[in-house]
Amino acid sequence: YELHVRGFTNHSSSGVKHPGTFAGLKEKIPYLKELGINAVELMPIFEFDEMINAREVDGKQLVEYWGYNTVGFFSPNASYTAAEEVNNEGQELKELIRELHENGIEVILDVVFNHTAEGNENGPFFSFKGFDNNIYYLLTPEGNYYNFSGCGNSLNCNHPVVQQMILECLRHWTVHYRVDGFRFDLASILGRDEDGMPMNNPPLLKSLAYDPLLRNVKLIAEAWDAGGLYQVGNFPASKRWAEWNGQYRDTMRGYLKGDFWEANS
């Protein structure tokens, strides 16, 4: 059951005391259990840049909602906590996960390692761009960013430094938060080399599959990217990896909607 932490309880009809938060989601566990589901996939919960959206509607600036522009890979999003105390989001998330587990529901995190909130070469400096731009991002010979994510940049995932960061991040969420699995957004970028070319045996994907601390977690690939690479049924990794099937999803959605074109595309 895929859900957005804020959106799932933000409306008053949810009936929770703490809408739009980890605590609010915890209040809805009986509802989730009644549905008979055995796992929830939380859309991105890492700290992200909510002000990256520069558009305005009726004179009010819109904010980033979905969470796919990560700023802090090791930190839960502070705006998802119900507590007034500072730095309580970690404890609140741990309590949510523990309660879900006690009710027989696993927790899978939607993680975004294909790009960051630093945008293109003209974007803001939050972290990696200032640490070592040449290491962390895929760059063209002219020094511009490869944009296989559609968000301005692409992480250089198979560089040893970046690979280690991703491994440490996943270990962190596995060991300290006890999550059960990860769904990797635009996972095909994780298999590109420093020139942006697809690799037959990407070091990162192999490391994730055989890392001892990750041996019991589920690994799920969204096996395509915005650069035209589509690898459903042919994702270059160990058999431990499962895949999202975008074409099947779209076909079923078209069928259920009665959309003949989408169901047959």
Model region roles, listed by residue range:
Residues 178, 191-195, 199-265:
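Conserved alpha/beta catalytic core and glycan-binding cleft of carbohydrate-active enzymes
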Residues 24:
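Active-site beta-loop-alpha junctions of metal-dependent nucleic acid enzymes
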